[in-house]
């Protein structure tokens, strides 16, 4: 191999690295700007995140109050909101920079096949996060608050022997509440990526609807394991997570089956489809 040939092959690599550097800088710049913006408005963001717990407490006639257990807790809550919120805010820009880096190396038909999944991924994440925030969190918090005891509960009769016991009431920590809420929201957002990921694999021919259906029982075990890992360590949270993930898995099978039928119809029209029976005879 001559020196000239080495130089010719090295040039495209250097160009790719330069392009990668440019895209990373754009993505990081967008993230930094988003982090600064979210830090400035961290208090309204945190107030928005407390709506589910405040509504659950209000339904029980209790005041909504979260405490600073540690002196530095408020600062770290603001930092966490800035970092997580900044990533969520900058995610479309990060995805766009990823696409700008990958797209030049794809054929036109590959771009048409891949672009819908690139758009669907953040959309499904935000759908999962919204589903968690507006539906799952109110249900979960109402369930958890049901374990309060004593006259802290609105309408409880203090003269009732059943209420003459140690008062067990909710005294929330800002940091712990943020951790719990973001863990729920992120978990549901990530789990809502399942149809996107499996459909993309089906589009690429790496998985089939029949294969996904045949490993359903193993998938159930995997879903239960994931539910136990990504949710708080209580049965109710894990059951809620599994009840959402499983329909997504079945929906993924349906989408992959539709892709397979569309591919088969196209190949039959082109005369390139080979039936299994014909393949066996050959």
From Swiss-Prot:
Its main location: membrane. Keywords: Cell inner membrane, Cell membrane, Membrane, Protein transport, Translocation, Transmembrane, Transmembrane helix, Transport. GO terms for biological process: intracellular protein transmembrane transport; protein transport by the Tat complex. This is Sec-independent protein translocase protein TatC. The keyword Coiled coil does not apply. It is found in: Cell inner membrane. The keyword Ubl conjugation does not apply. One of its GO terms (molecular function) is proton motive force dependent protein transmembrane transporter activity. PANTHER family: SEC-INDEPENDENT PROTEIN TRANSLOCASE PROTEIN TATC (PTHR30371), SEC-INDEPENDENT PROTEIN TRANSLOCASE PROTEIN TATC, CHLOROPLASTIC-RELATED (PTHR30371:SF0). Part of the twin-arginine translocation (Tat) system that transports large folded proteins containing a characteristic twin-arginine motif in their signal peptide across membranes. Together with TatB, TatC is part of a receptor directly interacting with Tat signal peptides. It is a multi-pass membrane protein. The chain crosses the membrane at residues 30-50, 74-94, 117-137, 184-204, 235-255. It comes from Rhodobacter capsulatus (strain ATCC BAA-309 / NBRC 16581 / SB1003). GO terms for cellular component: TAT protein transport complex. InterPro entries: TatC. The Tat system comprises two distinct complexes: a TatABC complex, containing multiple copies of TatA, TatB and TatC subunits, and a separate TatA complex, containing only TatA subunits. Substrates initially bind to the TatABC complex, which probably triggers association of the separate TatA complex to form the active translocon.
């Amino acid at each position: 191999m001559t020196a000239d040939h080495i130089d010719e092959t090295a040039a495209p690599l250097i160009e790719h690295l330069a392009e990668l550097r440019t895209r990373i800088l754009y993505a990081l710049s967008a993230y930094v700007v988003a982090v600064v913006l979210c830090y400035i408005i961290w208090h309204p963001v945190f107030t928005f995140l407390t709506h589910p717990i405040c509504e659950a407490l209000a339904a029980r006639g209790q005041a909504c109050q979260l405490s600073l257990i540690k002196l530095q807790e408020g600062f770290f809550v603001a930092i966490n909101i800035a970092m997580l919120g900044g990533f969520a805010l900058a995610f479309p820009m990060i995805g766009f920079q990823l696409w700008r880096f990958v797209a030049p190396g794809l054929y036109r038909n590959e771009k048409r096949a891949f672009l819908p999944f690139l758009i669907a991924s953040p959309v499904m994440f935000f759908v999962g996060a919204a589903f968690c925030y507006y539906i799952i969190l109110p249900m979960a918090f109402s369930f958890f608050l049901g374990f309060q005891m004593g006259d802290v509960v609105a309408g409880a009769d203090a003269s009732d022997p059943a209420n003459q016991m140690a008062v067990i009431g909710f005294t929330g920590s800002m940091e712990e509440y943020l951790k719990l809420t973001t863990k729920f929201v992120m978990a549901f957002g990530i789990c809502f990526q399942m149809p996107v990921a499996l459909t993309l694999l089906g589009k690429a021919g790496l998985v089939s609807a029949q294969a996904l259906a045949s490993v359903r029982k193993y998938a159930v075990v995997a879903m239960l394991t994931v539910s136990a890992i990504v949710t708080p360590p209580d049965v109710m949270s894990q059951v809620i997570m599994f009840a959402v993930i499983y329909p997504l898995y079945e929906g993924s099978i349906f989408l992959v089956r539709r892709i397979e039928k569309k591919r088969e119809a196209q190949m039959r029209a082109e005369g390139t489809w080979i039936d299994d029976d014909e393949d066996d005879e050959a």
